[in-house]
């Protein structure tokens, strides 16, 4: 991979100022139990669930820590060294890499997850770090909030940083949506969903490299 040398301090600050408030607001709502995330476990005899942050769980401690501006800045705009420190922090909160697994019905039946009551519709509340992080940073922030076209334009890359051969220009035609390069998560969002919109983890790349 080729080094991306177009990143500037001003670019990082603009990125933080644009997205930090939204992320922080979601974090606070999760901490206060105001957001529940619908889901289900199993294919037959499905269990209706709602993911919800329970106080003093690892999920709660992570959100409480990284909702603070200095830590949130590291999460969104930190160097690679700082992102690796965040991963180590998560591993210390949740040992044995359990946070990387998605919730399963079998593990639920073994009472592996924290049950936090039953909602009025009969859905059971569980606190599962990976599922909640994926909803916040991938489903909500990356898919719906992140202005991907603006992000790519500001970086100003012309050649794919992975292969160094394919062009990744943005094509704009009057009356048509702009055609933009793919954005790859260098550290995969399936394993590290909390880095879903971390600036340095977002790599504009060509179609071929994104499919590898």
Which residues make up each language-model segment?
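N-terminal accessory alpha/beta regions
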Residues: 1-140
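Short secondary-structure capping/junction motifs at helix and strand boundaries
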Residues: 123, 143-145, 170-171
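Short Cys/His-rich Zn2+-coordinating modules
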Residues: 135-148, 184-191
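Short, flexible, mixed-charge glycine/proline-rich loop motifs
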Residues: 146-156, 194-199
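The −1 position to Zn-ligating cysteines in a subset of zinc-ribbon hairpins
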Residues: 159, 182, 205
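Short, cysteine/histidine-rich loop/knuckle motifs that typically chelate Zn2+
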Residues: 161-165, 208
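Histidine-centered nuclease catalytic patch
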Residues: 167-201
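Short Cys/His-centered divalent metal-binding micro-motifs
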Residues: 202-212
């Amino acid at each position: 991979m080729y080094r991306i040398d177009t990143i500037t301090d001003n670019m990082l600050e603009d990125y933080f100022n644009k997205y930090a408030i939204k992320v922080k607001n979601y974090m606070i709502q999760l901490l206060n139990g105001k957001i529940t995330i619908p889901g289900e476990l199993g294919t037959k005899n499905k269990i209706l669930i709602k993911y919800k942050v329970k106080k003093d769980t690892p999920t709660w401690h992570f959100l409480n820590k990284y909702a603070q501006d200095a830590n949130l800045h590291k999460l969104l705009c930190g160097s690679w060294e700082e992102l690796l420190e965040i991963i180590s922090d998560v591993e210390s909160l949740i040992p044995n890499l359990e946070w990387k697994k998605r919730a399963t019905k079998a593990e639920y039946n073994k009472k592996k997850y924290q049950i936090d009551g039953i909602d009025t519709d009969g859905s059971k509340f569980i606190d599962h770090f990976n599922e909640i992080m994926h909803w916040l940073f991938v489903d909500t922030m990356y898919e719906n909030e992140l202005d991907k076209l603006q992000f790519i334009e500001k970086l100003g890359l012309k050649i794919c940083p992975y292969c160094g051969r394919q062009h990744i220009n943005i094509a704009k035609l009057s009356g048509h949506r702009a055609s933009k390069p793919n954005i790859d998560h260098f550290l995969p969002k399936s394993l590290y969903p909390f880095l879903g919109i971390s600036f340095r983890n977002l790599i504009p790349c060509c179609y071929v490299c994104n499919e590898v």
